[in-house]
Amino acid sequence: MAVPKRKKSKSRRNMHRSHCRLKVPNIGIDKTTGEYKLSHHVCLGGYYNEKQVLEVDSSNV
């Protein structure tokens, strides 16, 4: 079994774990509908960057 030759300091241990955390999703408000949406995603109304890119049935929304 592999064993470390020297003890890893608390600083180096924490730097090693710096990416191991929960990340907050990048949520913004859609300008056309006023609802929350993920950035760089199409909203439920079919809009992306204030332009309609998808035809959405009103019965599904």
From Swiss-Prot:
Any one GO CC term of the record: large ribosomal subunit
- The answer to whether UniProt assigns keyword Ribosomal protein to this entry is yes
Task: List where the protein spans the membrane.
Answer: none
GO biological process, any: translation
| Superkingdom of source | Bacteria
Instruction: Enumerate the Pfam families for this protein.
Output: Ribosomal_L32p
Q: Which UniProt keywords apply?
A: Ribonucleoprotein, Ribosomal protein
Mind telling me which InterPro entries this protein's record contains?
A: Ribosomal_bL32, Ribosomal_bL32_bact, Ribosomal_zn-bd
The UniProt GO MF terms for this protein read: structural constituent of ribosome
Q: Which PANTHER family match?
A: 50S RIBOSOMAL PROTEIN L32 (PTHR35534), LARGE RIBOSOMAL SUBUNIT PROTEIN BL32 (PTHR35534:SF1)
Q: Which family does it belong to?
A: Belongs to the bacterial ribosomal protein bL32 family.
Q: Which NCBIfam families does the UniProt entry name for this protein?
A: rpmF_bact
Q: State what protein this is by name.
A: Large ribosomal subunit protein bL32
Which species is listed as the source?
Answer: Ehrlichia chaffeensis (strain ATCC CRL-10679 / Arkansas)
Gene behind this chain? Answer: rpmF
